[in-house]
Design a protein with these regions (language model features):
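Conserved ABC ATPase "signature" region
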Residues: 70-71, 119-136
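ABC-type ATPase nucleotide-binding domains, specifically the catalytic core motifs of the NBD
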Residues: 15-17, 108-120, 130-132
């Protein structure tokens, strides 16, 4: 079976007026199906750029990226959009929930975009159960929830299209330590159920939950 994610000699250079900035410098690595890994590094090291590349939100300057054996540079914009929508779930530090929609509607939003259908309440409730959000909150709006509860909603939204890969950018960065630990416990449960999870973090306590850590400094993998 092909790795779910594979980088081969990937370089990303951002041209600026002050001069080119190399965000990723000849990066090569693989992520197998079902792995739970963390990406660590100091601010500006390239770890968020790496996550962006994994999510097909940007293209490399050179090198190749494969998602489940498919080389992204061979795919059209429409194919890349479908790949992101169908196979990749995104979880961010800032929850990016819609304040005027209730929790069921927020969770259902990616599915509504996919099929242009009405809210699939049954599916939304299924994933909300999976992230252990109390049922009495389902008709509330995000601003009525705590930070930890909002992050659970964001995770449920990422799960609703049953992605192969979950990409998480500092998922506990906006939470207190106790709430952050509960979110990482949830991630561990999702991993045990077969999810491939990649977490960008600066927090070594978060990295302890994962199976292995990729450390990146100045755009290069150092361990």
């Amino acid at each position: 079976m092909a790795p779910v994610i594979q980088f081969k000699d990937v370089v990303k250079i951002y041209p600026l007026k002050s001069g080119d900035v190399t965000a990723l410098d000849h990066i090569s690595f693989e992520v197998d199906h079902g792995e739970f890994i963390s990406i660590m590094g100091p601010s500006g090291s390239g770890k968020s750029t790496l996550l962006t590349m994994m999510g097909c939100l940007d293209t490399p300057t050179s090198g190749d990226i494969f998602i489940s054996g498919l080389r992204t540079r061979d795919m059209s914009d429409t194919e890349l959009t479908n790949l992101r929508r169908d196979r990749i779930g995104f979880i961010f530090q800032y929850f990016n929930l819609f304040p005027l929609l209730n929790i069921i509607e927020n969770v259902s939003f990616p599915q509504m975009l996919k099929s242009q259908a009405q809210v699939d309440e049954k599916k939304a409730i299924e994933v909300l159960h999976a992230v252990q959000l109390d049922e009495h909150l389902y008709t509330h709006t995000p601003l009525e929830l705590s930070g930890g509860q909002q992050q659970r909603v964001a995770i449920a939204r990422a799960l609703i299209n049953e992605p192969d890969i979950l990409l998480c950018d500092e998922p506990t960065g906006n939470l207190d330590s106790k709430t952050g630990a509960s979110i990482m416990d949830l991630m561990t449960d999702l991993h045990k159920n077969g999810s491939t999870i990649i977490v960008v973090t600066h927090d070594p306590h978060v990295a302890e939950y994962t199976e292995r850590t990729i450390r990146i400094v100045d755009g290069r993998i150092v361990s």
